[in-house]
Amino acid sequence: MRLATDPAGSSSGLPQPRRVAVLSVHTSPLAQPGTGDAGGMNVYVLQTSLELARRGVEVEIFTRATSSADQPIVSVAPGVVVRNVVAGPFEGLDKNDLPTQLCAFTAGVLRAEATHEPGYYDILHSHYWLSGQVGWLAADRWAVPLVHTAHTLAAVKNASLAAGDTPEPPMRAIGEQQVVDEADRLIVNTEHEAQQLVSLHHADPGRIDVVHPGVDLATFTPGDRAAARAALGLDPAARIVAFVGRIQPLKAPDVLLRAAALLPDVHVVIAGGPSGSGMATPDNLVHLAGELGIAERVTFLPPQSRDHLVRVYRAADIVAVPSHNESFGLVAVEAQACGTPVVAAAVGGLPVAVRDGVSGALVHSHEPDAWATTLGEVFAADPSTFGRAAVDHAATFSWAHTVDALLTGYGRAIADHRADNTLQVAARRSGRRFSMRRGVRA
């Protein structure tokens, strides 16, 4: 495994796709991040698709329709369309029930592809294990390589469950193993995630590409803090720590509230909507803030559009990411791009997203007193001293860089797939059996 942007992994000389089919079964790239199942993955799928289209690559994204008002085909931008596939009831279907609808979703994907001429897609990229299950079948049917991004793994999540959170079911871990075995290439966010795939799922390191996610550097920029606070109705003189994301135990907004209770002059802004179980609704957090005696120091905002999210980042002195696990942490990079330092849990990909002691600080605990101590230290050092370094660090994560690396991974997958086809022909001529994903057999 290696960074797909390493000189040895340059896309120069590798075949490049003309058209890519992208699968995102459980959440639409057009959904508002910060609520339900919509989060960083939605942003990743949409932004990489838009950047691919800028390079002349056509992208079709398949997702499950969740409303009768969803149009079958939505044109997002030149070269990017979203296909809303009808699979099961539009509403009221929990993500854990979606495996029952994978046959219906797969049928919808295959029928859509059948409207094109044979060989229309050059590659298929699935996101999350549910999509991987569909992608495994579709890739075999279309005779194209399957590239898969897990985003999260059941074994990792279950090893870092928050109090009140629901463990991932065994069928997910089984499904993830199947997809790891069947995919031609695996895209991961960090080297740490690559090591997890190898240790937990015995993935072949040679089939793994490390591709860091990006940030929209034209949208997320430093700006006037006073103006941002005025727009949000926040005290211009307050010391503000912001939390942005889905309100669910995994994201641990309760840890931030408990830490704030130990910092008498800190105001907390929480921007996000409900997701998951346990301490998973704004109402529950409102109740917790009341119990802690800090209700008057906490402001709750609904999920924000990108333009409004920029104001939240700019308004904050610090953005907190106390998650129990993050495969990367796009919120951390977006905040730093706005010149706001980040205090984050030292888990998953966050040590890559945040430069400890330079663009923010990492906390090696989820205990409120440890968080209060680190937040206090950053305030004492003056958060603005981290601002320039935060912007510089975020500048290394652009969607252009991400897609450069992604195209390298795609090129490797296509080249290997073509080589397999050559071996398949040779094997047939010699009377030997051949599996596209297992090689020549006696």
Curated annotation (Swiss-Prot):
Function: Catalyzes the transfer of a N-acetyl-glucosamine moiety to 1D-myo-inositol 3-phosphate to produce 1D-myo-inositol 2-acetamido-2-deoxy-glucopyranoside 3-phosphate in the mycothiol biosynthesis pathway.
Residues that, per the record, bind Mg(2+): Y313, R314, A316, T340
Matching HAMAP family: MshA
InterPro entries: Glyco_trans_1, Glyco_trans_4-like_N, Mycothiol_biosynthesis_MshA
Name by which UniProt lists this protein: D-inositol 3-phosphate glycosyltransferase
Keyword Zinc (UniProt): no
Keyword terms: Glycosyltransferase, Magnesium, Metal-binding, Transferase
Taxonomic path: Bacteria, Bacillati, Actinomycetota, Actinomycetes, Mycobacteriales
Chain positions recorded as UDP-N-acetyl-alpha-D-glucosamine binding sites: Q32, P33, G40, R246, K251, Q304, E326, E334
SUBUNIT field: Homodimer.
Example of a GO MF term: magnesium ion binding
EC number per UniProt: 2.4.1.250
Family: Belongs to the glycosyltransferase group 1 family. MshA subfamily.
GO biological process, one term: mycothiol biosynthetic process
Reaction catalyzed: 1D-myo-inositol 3-phosphate + UDP-N-acetyl-alpha-D-glucosamine = 1D-myo-inositol 2-acetamido-2-deoxy-alpha-D-glucopyranoside 3-phosphate + UDP + H(+)
Gene: mshA
PANTHER family cross-referenced by the UniProt entry: D-INOSITOL 3-PHOSPHATE GLYCOSYLTRANSFERASE (PTHR12526:SF510), GLYCOSYLTRANSFERASE (PTHR12526)
Keyword Transferase: yes
Binding site for 1D-myo-inositol 3-phosphate: H26, D37, A38, G39, G40, M41, N42, K95, Y128, T152, R172
